Each structure stands twice: as structure tokens, then as C-alpha cells.
Amino acid sequence: MSCHNCARRTLGLFIRSFANVEPTFAPKRTLIRNAQPSRLLHASTARAPYKSDQRDRAAPPTQKEADIEAIAENAENAEDDALPAKYERPAWQAHKAALKEKLNGEAWNPRKKLSPDTMEGIRHLHSTQPDKFTTPVLAQHFKVSPEAIRRILKSKWQPSDEEYEARMERWNKRGERIWTNLVEMGVKPPKKWREMGVGRARGGERPKWKSDRRNLVHVRDSASDSFVMDDGDIIPIVDGTGKARRAPDIPLTRRL
């Protein structure tokens, strides 16, 4: 019986070798990589979300938390308002910013300019008696803005001899040009400019400042607007005693 079983077993192994033929080399497998990870993952293998995702998905703050944030913000604003005065912007910086805004970023170029000698006199007056010759007083007397006086007093620049001569030459040319235009309008130039030839007539003609149009143009001087003098005080009338007396007031009806 054992021999029969052995023969049967041998025959079965022989038939199985022809039915189930396995290749000697295993076939090459193709690897497919997905661009995105599969969302159908098990709960145990799924990755944990990032902290940013957790913050984005966080619940909105409650009313209590909003009140706490508002109280903290009000406390910070109160601390900013309670800062000492030394942290505030200095006055000169505020003045500079306001002046820059007023000039629209342009350079300082006033229409009325004072001569170099006048500016030196302003500095001398302010240095000797600063309580008397203040910036408003000097600005009112010389008919310029307080900002111009402030800049003159602030300037410490001292020209050299060559720079001073060139500066005075430019100033004389400027004065000659201005007074030449005023002579054309009938204004008598000062003696300094007449000696320099301003308003001098040529060919035996009469100077224009001696014509009928003389002094028809109003020229402002250094006197204040409140300075008023009566006509009788300008040219006093002297009687036999040598004392000045006022001209009699004659009504207009009698003078006609």
C-alpha cells in the first residue's frame, strides 16, 4: 500500500510541475506616483494638521476676550498720552515743518531784501539791546516779515574780503536797476545814486524826476503806518518873534 501511495504522490508532483509553471525571474513592476496624497487614509495614518490651519479654523473670540483686548488697547493709548514733554517735538522742528509747508518746498526767497550793511546793523542792535530790539520790533521798523529778521539774527556767516566786494557790487547793480525804473516813473533818486549817474539826463534834456510826474508814485519808507504829521508842522511859518505858529484854518467856502 505504501508503494501505491508513493507512486500516486510521485505522479501528482509530476502533473503539478506542468500545470503551475512559475517564471524563473519575477516581472518588473511599474511604480505609479500620485501628485497628491490620497485622502482616503485611515485615521491612524492621517497626518496631523499644521498650527496655521488650527489658527485659521479657531473659533471667533468671545465677548469677554474682546473686552479684555479693548481694555489693553485703551491702557496703551493712555500711556502714550501720559508721556513727558521731553518726548514731544521741539518748537524749532514744528516751526521748520510749518514754514516748509507754507513755502511748498521752495527755497527762501523774500521779495524785499535788505542791504548787507542793514543786516549788520540789525545784528548789532539785537546783540547790544536784545530786550528792546526784539524780532517783532525790528520787523515792524524795517518793513519785513519776522521770519526774515529771525533768519538774519540766526546767520553767523562772515564773508571774506573778496566775497564782501563781490556782494557789494551785486547790491549796487541791484539798487541801480531799481532806481532806474523808479526814475522812469518820476521818483527822484537819492544823492548816492544820482552821483552814480542814475536819472541823469542826456543831450541837455530835463531829468524825468524833475518833470510834472515827479513824486506821483508812492514810496514807502521805514516810518510806521500810524506816524501822522500835520501839513502845518512840515513847513512851519515863522512870525516876527521867531516862534513858529500854525497856519490859520480857513474854511473852504472862504478860500473859494
Curated annotation (Swiss-Prot):
Record: transit peptide: 1-48
Source species, domain of life: Eukaryota
Subcellular location: Mitochondrion
Main location: mitochondrion
This protein's UniProt keywords: Mitochondrion, Transit peptide
GO cellular component, one term: mitochondrion
Region described as Disordered: spans on this chain: 38-65
Family: Belongs to the RRG9 family.
PANTHER family, per database record: NEUGRIN
Function recorded in the entry: Required for respiratory activity and maintenance and expression of the mitochondrial genome.
Record protein name field: Required for respiratory growth protein 9, mitochondrial
Organism: Phaeosphaeria nodorum (strain SN15 / ATCC MYA-4574 / FGSC 10173) (Glume blotch fungus)
Gene designation: RRG9
